[in-house]
Structure formats: C-alpha cells, structure tokens
A protein has these predicted regions:
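Conserved active-site alpha-helix within GNAT-family acetyltransferase domains
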Residues: 133-150
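Conserved acetyl-CoA-binding loop-helix of GNAT-fold acetyltransferases
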Residues: 104-118, 139, 143
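A short helix-loop-beta-strand connector motif used in the catalytic cores of GNAT acetyltransferases and
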Residues: 55-66
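Conserved beta-strand in the GNAT
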Residues: 66, 74-83, 92
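Conserved catalytic-core motifs of GNAT/GCN5-like acyltransferases
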Residues: 129, 147-163
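A short, well-structured alpha-helix characteristic of acyl/acetyltransferase catalytic modules
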Residues: 1-53
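A short, internal acetyl-CoA/4′-phosphopantetheine-binding micro-motif in the GNAT/acyltransferase core
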Residues: 68, 94-105
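Conserved GNAT acetyl-CoA-binding A-motif
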Residues: 121-130
Length: 170
C-alpha cells in the first residue's frame, strides 16, 4: 500500500496542504481561542506551551495538514491522518480543529470529505476518535456519516476519560 499521508487536497472552500514548521504562529493564532477546546480532553490547548506539544506531534506524524480558507488564504485549522493499519485496511482521521467562525457550516464537511475521498482510494475503513465529553465533535461525526463503533479508555497514565470511536467504511 502506498498511502500518501500528506497530499495537497483542494475543494471549493478549503485547501489542505502538508503542515510545515513555519506554520506555527498562524496555526497557533487560529487555535488560541479557549472556546475551541472547552469540550476537548486537552482543554488547555489554547495555551502556547500546550499547543506547542500538539504542533510538534503534528509535524512528527508526517500526516498533518494546514487547513486553509481558500477565500482569505489564511490557516483556519488542522487535521491529520494517523495510525495507518495496512493489514486492517484502516486509517484514522483526527486531531482536527477549526476556528469557531468556521463551525457549523460546510467547512468541516468539505475538509473531511476531501480526506475521506483520498483515504478510500487506499483503505476500506476510516476511524475517528473523539473524547467522550466532546459532544460537539460527536455531533459533527454523525453529520458526516460516522457510525458509533466502540468506547475505550483514553490511553495515558491516570486517565479516567473515555474515547468514543466512530467509523466510516467505503
């Protein structure tokens, strides 16, 4: 399988391109609103030192995207492919956020559809992992056709939070 984790994907509203180290300041500006993270398991990700960990992990993953509003040319969020499992014909899409001005409309739907269309040229199943208390993201998963799959404890020492898994199949 030759799954390209960071292609450039272009729709009417957004372009997804590989996230670069030089994107930190603009992406942090997009992420610095505490309300973006209020239901997220990492609720302090709006703080620069916490966001730096997220950003470094995104760069290291070699599957992260900068999400760009095609009208303004500005970075409005990020998402990534993660946890590619060729034997199971599966990949995860996650670590996604958008600025609040882009919530509730077509931006998330188009971003995810671009990623799904690309993924389904290589795999049969796409998995999304959402924090149990992140009801906003769970509703967004349902809007794009995600089906509840399972619930598991969130990994990490001392974590008592649960993750909810959604799946979309080709």
């Amino acid at each position: 399988m030759n799954f390209q984790l960071q292609p450039t994907l272009t729709g009417k509203l957004v372009q997804l391109r590989p996230l670069q180290p030089a994107d930190f300041d603009e992406l942090f500006a997009a992420a610095s609103d505490p309300l973006i993270w209020e239901q997220h398991p990492e609720s302090t990700r709006y703080k620069k030192e916490v966001f730096q960990i997220y950003f470094d992990s995104a760069i290291e993953s070699k599957g992260a995207f900068a999400v760009i509003d095609r009208k303004s040319g500005k970075i409005i969020g990020s998402s990534r492919y993660w946890n590619l499992k060729p034997l199971e014909s599966e990949v995860e899409i996650g670590w996604t956020f958008l600025q609040r001005a882009y919530w509730g409309g077509e931006y998330n739907r188009e971003m995810k559809q671009l990623m799904l269309d690309h993924a389904f040229t290589f795999v049969e199943r796409v998995v999304f992992v959402v924090g149990e208390n992140n009801l906003r993201s769970q509703k967004a998963m349902q809007k794009i056709g995600g089906r509840f799959w399972k619930k598991e404890p969130r990994p990490g020492p001392g974590s008592n939070q649960m993750n909810v898994f959604f799946v979309i199949t080709r």
